[in-house]
């Protein structure tokens, strides 16, 4: 069971881990060259070498005790799908641009062009595409498949008493002019929702908390940890 441990309740030990990790399933990480997924992130945390975007090898000096892969819930897995010419998102104009992008600058231009698709209400202060906007760049089948990849990787790598994994993701609540506060949502065990609550569902953290309360009524426990106010 993910999140479980064999350490007794009377034991007091210092454990070291990371609850904020992005992989190629996150749009910002993908645009910056990351292609490895949750499996590689967990292997790295346990001391295994993994390839870096530059072609070198990355290896942590001391393995961690616990970790959660917390990819962005918004557009989870969509960037890799856009980069695939055989997928639906890969046939979108921005997908075609991404496939043909040769430089980091070009990828960043596509990244900013996608703000309208993250935020069709224009809360962030970027261009408001209007009330008739159709988000043809968001395929929830892709999002749910990526979410399942996150779940499966956590379950595969969990070794109670040796290395503990948590299923989680990042929720970003936008405010005017991109004033935001990021929250890592960490689930207690293996019972998790079918898909994460994302900024496309609501920009209000109160709505996130209400969603978590509804999950709790179903026996699904989660904790939202604020971690970053960048852009605020």
Which stretches of residues belong to each language-model region?
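Extended, charged catalytic domains and RNA/DNA-binding interfaces, predominantly
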Residues: 1-232
């Amino acid at each position: 069971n993910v999140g479980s441990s064999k350490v007794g309740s009377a034991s007091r030990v210092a454990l070291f881990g990371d609850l904020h990790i992005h992989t190629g399933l996150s749009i910002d990480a993908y645009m910056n060259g990351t292609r490895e997924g949750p499996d590689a992130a967990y292997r790295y945390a346990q001391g295994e070498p993994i390839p870096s975007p530059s072609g070198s090898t990355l290896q942590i000096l001391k393995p961690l005790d616990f970790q959660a892969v917390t990819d962005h819930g918004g557009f989870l897995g969509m960037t890799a799908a856009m980069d695939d010419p055989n997928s639906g998102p890969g046939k979108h104009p921005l997908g075609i641009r991404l496939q043909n992008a040769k430089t980091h600058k070009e990828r960043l231009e596509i990244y900013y062009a996608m703000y309208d698709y993250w935020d069709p209400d224009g809360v962030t202060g970027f261009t408001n595409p209007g009330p008739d906007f159709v988000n043809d760049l968001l395929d929830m089948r892709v999002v749910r498949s990526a979410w399942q990849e996150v779940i499966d990787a956590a379950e595969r790598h969990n070794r109670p008493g040796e290395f503990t994994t948590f299923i989680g993701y990042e929720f970003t609540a936008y405010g005017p002019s991109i004033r935001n506060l990021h929250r890592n949502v960490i689930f207690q065990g293996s019972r998790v929702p079918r898909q994460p609550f994302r900024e496309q569902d609501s920009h209000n953290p109160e709505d996130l908390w209400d969603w978590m309360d509804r999950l709790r009524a179903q026996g699904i426990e989660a904790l939202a940890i604020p971690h970053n106010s960048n852009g605020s």
